C-alpha cells in the first residue's frame, strides 16, 4: 500500500501576479468585443504606484488602456493608499507594439480551417475523477479558500481583510485515493489594527472550516494561519507582479505536467491558451465517459501549421481501453486545429477576465468544461 502527500497552492485576485493577469485579460476582452480578428499578446508589470503594460497587439479596436487598468485594480479592491496600492493615483504606462508581419503570414489563411498555429508549443490537459469537477482536490480546495477570503472581504464581513492572500493545501493519498488533509496554510493581508488571535480564529471559522470537507480534517491536520505573524504590506508594495507567473496555480496545481506557456493576455490564436483549453476539454470528456480515472493529454504544434504535430495520452494504468485507442478516438472526434478548436469551444468572446483568478479549469461557466462528447466517445 502506497501512501504519499501532495500539495497545491493558490493565490487571491489581489496577489500582484494576479493583478497583472487580470489587467492583461481585461484589455484582451475589450479588444475582442470590438475586433474578432485581433492578435493580442498583452503583458503587464505592477509595482508600488505603477503599472507598465507592453506586448504586441494588432487590431482595429480602440481601447482606453488607462481606464480599463484603473477599473480592474479598483474592482480587485486596491482603492486607497491604506491597501498599499491605489487604482486612482497609480501611474499607468503603455509600451504596446504590433505583432510581427512574419507571424501574421504564417497564421492567417484564406480558408479559416487552415489557420496555422500562432507559435510552436507543447500543451498539456488533465482530468481526474477524485472531485465532482474532475479536477485534482489539492488545487480545487486551494482555490476555494482564497475565493472565500475574497467573498468575505468584498461583503465586508471581515472588515480587516485586504486583497492579497495565499493558500496551500496538502492532501494525503493512499493507493491513489484521498484519505485526509495533512496540512493547510493560509496567509492573508490585513489591517494593522487586527490582532493575530482574532485573525487566526476568524480565518479558521469563517474560511477554512466552511470550505474544507470535515471528513478529511482530522486531529492530526496541521493549520498554519499567517505563520509569519504579520501581513500588512502586500500586493504590489510587497512584491512586483507579472503576467503569466502563476501558471501552475492557473492549471492543475502541479498534478499534471505543464508545457510552460502562460494564458493571460493572449488571444485564442495562441495555442498556449486555446489548445490548453481544448486539452482539458478532451481529458475531461474521457474521464467523464468512464474511459479512465485519470487522463493527461499532450498536444504539440508548429508555427504556421494547422494540424497538431503530436498527440499523446497517458492514463496512469487507469484506462479502460488502450492509450492508442483513446488517441484514435480523439483524432476522430475533436478538431484540434487552431481554428477548429476556437470554433469548437466558441473562444472568440470576451470571457477571459473571469479566467484570470481562481483557476482556468474546473469551473462550469467555461465552455471547455462542457461534457458534450461523452456519448460520442462511448459509441
Swiss-Prot record:
User: Annotated region Flexible loop: where?
Assistant: 99-109
Keywords, sorted A to Z: ATP-binding, Cytoplasm, Magnesium, Metal-binding, Nucleotide-binding, One-carbon metabolism, Potassium, Transferase
Binding residues annotated for K(+), in chain numbering = 43
Q: What is its EC number?
A: 2.5.1.6
Q: Name one GO cellular component term.
A: cytoplasm
The record's subcellular locations are: Cytoplasm
User: Which of this chain's residues are annotated to bind ATP?
Assistant: 15, 164-166, 230-231, 239, 245-246, 262, 266
Record-listed L-methionine binding positions: 56, 99, 239, 270
- Specify the superkingdom: Bacteria
GO terms of molecular function: ATP binding; magnesium ion binding; methionine adenosyltransferase activity
Q: Does Lipid biosynthesis show up as a keyword for this record? A: no
Q: Please give the catalytic activity noted in the UniProt record.
A: L-methionine + ATP + H2O = S-adenosyl-L-methionine + phosphate + diphosphate
Query: Which of this chain's residues are annotated to bind Mg(2+)?
Result: 17
Q: How is the cofactor bound?
A: Binds 2 divalent ions per subunit.
| Cofactors (names) | Mg(2+); K(+)
Q: Which NCBIfam families match?
A: metK
Give the family this protein belongs to, as stated in its UniProt record.
Belongs to the AdoMet synthase family.
Quaternary structure and partners: Homotetramer; dimer of dimers.
Q: Return the protein name.
A: S-adenosylmethionine synthase
Source species:
Buchnera aphidicola subsp. Schizaphis graminum (strain Sg)
Q: Which gene name does the record give?
A: metK
Amino acid at each position: 500500500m502506497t501512501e504519499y502527500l501532495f500539495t497545491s497552492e493558490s493565490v487571491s485576485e489581489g496577489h500582484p501576479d494576479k493583478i497583472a493577469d487580470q489587467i492583461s485579460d481585461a484589455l484582451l476582452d475589450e479588444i475582442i468585443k470590438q475586433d474578432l480578428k485581433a492578435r493580442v499578446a498583452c503583458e503587464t508589470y505592477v509595482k508600488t504606484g505603477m503599472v507598465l503594460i507592453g506586448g504586441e497587439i494588432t487590431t482595429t479596436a480602440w481601447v482606453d488602456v488607462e481606464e480599463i487598468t484603473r477599473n480592474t485594480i479598483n474592482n480587485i479592491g486596491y482603492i486607497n493608499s491604506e491597501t498599499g496600492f491605489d487604482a486612482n493615483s497609480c501611474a499607468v504606462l503603455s509600451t504596446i507594439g504590433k505583432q510581427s508581419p512574419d507571424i501574421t503570414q504564417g497564421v492567417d489563411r484564406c480558408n479559416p480551417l487552415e489557420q496555422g498555429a500562432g507559435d510552436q508549443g507543447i500543451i498539456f490537459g488533465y482530468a481526474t475523477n477524485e472531485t465532482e469537477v474532475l479536477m485534482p482536490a489539492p488545487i480545487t480546495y486551494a482555490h476555494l479558500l482564497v475565493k472565500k477570503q475574497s467573498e468575505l472581504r468584498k461583503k465586508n464581513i471581515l472588515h480587516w481583510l485586504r486583497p492579497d492572500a495565499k493558500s496551500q493545501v496538502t492532501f494525503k493519498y493512499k493507493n491513489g485515493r484521498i484519505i485526509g488533509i495533512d496540512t493547510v496554510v493560509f496567509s492573508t493581508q490585513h489591517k494593522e489594527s487586527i490582532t493575530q488571535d482574532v485573525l487566526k480564529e476568524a480565518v479558521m471559522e469563517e474560511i477554512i472550516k466552511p470550505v474544507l470537507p470535515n471528513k478529511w480534517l482530522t486531529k492530526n491536520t496541521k493549520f498554519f494561519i499567517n505563520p509569519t505573524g504579520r501581513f500588512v504590506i502586500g500586493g504590489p508594495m510587497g512584491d512586483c507582479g507579472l503576467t503569466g507567473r502563476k501558471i501552475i496555480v492557473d492549471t492543475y496545481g502541479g498534478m499534471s505536467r505543464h508545457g510552460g506557456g502562460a494564458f493571460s493576455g493572449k488571444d485564442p490564436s495562441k495555442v498556449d491558451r486555446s489548445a490548453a483549453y481544448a486539452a482539458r476539454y478532451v481529458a475531461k470528456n474521457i474521464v467523464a465517459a468512464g474511459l479512465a480515472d485519470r487522463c493527461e493529454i499532450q498536444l504539440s504544434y508548429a508555427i504556421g501549421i494547422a494540424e497538431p504535430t503530436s498527440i499523446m495520452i497517458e492514463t496512469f494504468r487507469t484506462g479502460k481501453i488502450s492509450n492508442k485507442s483513446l488517441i484514435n478516438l480523439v483524432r476522430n472526434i475533436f478538431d484540434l486545429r487552431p481554428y477548429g478548436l476556437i470554433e469548437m469551444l466558441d473562444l472568440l468572446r470576451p470571457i477571459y477576465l473571469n479566467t484570470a483568478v481562481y483557476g482556468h479549469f474546473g469551473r462550469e461557466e467555461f465552455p471547455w468544461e462542457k461534457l458534450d462528447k461523452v456519448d460520442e466517445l462511448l459509441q
